[in-house]
Amino acid sequence: QNYVVVPVSADRGLCGGFNSSINKETFRLVKSLEDDGKNVQLMPVGKKSRDFFNRVMKDKILDSFADLNVSVNGYDAALQVSNKLQELYFDGKFDKCIIVFNKFKSAISQEVTQQQLIPLDVSDSSKEENVDDSAVKAIYDYEPDEETILKDLLPKNVSIQIFKVLLESDAGEHGARMAAMDNATRNAGEMIDSLTLKYNRTRQAFITKELIEIISGA
């Protein structure tokens, strides 16, 4: 099977381990898939992942995206990635696509997450155990037909899933950067206090030494 892995990172740094965690998880996933005999290619989203994998796995990069700026460009940013993925999929370039991103948990917490994007992963866990499928299907009437509707909806679903991922990653990036800058400011404050104390002690010792020399000379 041919896989495409899409790591989603930020375009900028100064956000703690936000980018490195994505790159490490993607690297681990690629090696794991290759150990299982899979053929793996990459399509990094974000400069930090693109630059990292250009150094360590350049031969595996199928395409890449940077400066999507989802907070400004919105859904159009997701469409750029989605359209390229679907084009490659329908051309038979890959069988499965997995996206790796930082899932937003809170302003100070993000969780590295893997999600199968293509083909659509329909989990049975979302179904009610006591629901009769035949009874549910009997309620709905499809026009024109289920297959035609799915052909239209599935590409849109991929685009929406990517849009969701980009938004979560963007929110997580801002949270991670805020936390990183807060820690840096706190550490800088502690360093200033430490250096100020060291300076005052050195100055005091120097003055004491001069006084002793003056007294000794007198």
Regions found by a protein language model. Name each.
Residues 1-218:
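C-terminal beta-strand-loop-alpha-helix "lid" module of Rossmann-like NAD(P)-dependent dehydrogenases
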